[in-house]
Amino acid sequence: MVSPEVLERDRSAHLPSWPIVLLIVGLAALYLATQGWRDRHLFLINATESLPNWAFVVERGTSPVRGKLAFFVVPRTPLIVAHFGKEPQPFGKTVYGMPGDIVTRADNWVSVNGARVAHLKALSKRGEPLAPGPLGRVPQDCYFMGSPHPDGFDSRYADIGWVCDKQIVGTGTTVL
C-alpha cells in the first residue's frame, strides 16, 4: 500500500508551480494588451535623408496637426515607382499647410501663408524633371506636407501634391 504522503508528492511533482502559472498568465495578459496597441500603431523606419530621424511610431487614424509629423500613402506615379518601388512604404513629412492655407511660389521658393517652407528643384538627383506642385488654397481635408531637406520629395512637387485625408495613415512620433 502507498502512503498518502507519497501520493501527494507524486501528484505535486506533475503540477506546475505557482510562479510558472503566474508567468504564463502574465505573458498572456501582456500579449492581449499589445494586440490593441499593435492595431492602432505602426513602427516605421525612414530610409531617406529627408527627415533627420530614422525611426518612428505612427498612431493610426489620427489627424494631421500643423508642424507635426504625419505619415501617408503616396500616389503610384512613374517617378515614385522608379525611386521607391511598386509598393512604396508610407512617407513621413511635416505638416506645413492645413486646409484653407495659401501656398505660393516665387523664385523657386514655396511658401505657406507667406512663410518660406521649401526650395523647388528642376531635376531629381537622377536627372529626371520634377514638376512643381499645386498652388493656391489648400483644399478641405487636404494638407501641404514637406521637409526641410533640400532633396525632400513632398508636396512641393506634383507627384506628391496635396495629401488628403484618404491617404493619411496617422501621425508620428520620433523614436530614434
Role assignments for model-derived ranges:
Residues K86-V117:
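Mid-length scaffold segments of soluble, non-membrane domains
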Residues M1-P90, A158-L176:
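Protein maturation boundaries and topogenic segments
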Residues T62-S63, H119-G127:
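A short, sequence-level motif marking secondary-structure junctions
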Residues G67-A70, D101, C142:
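Structural motif
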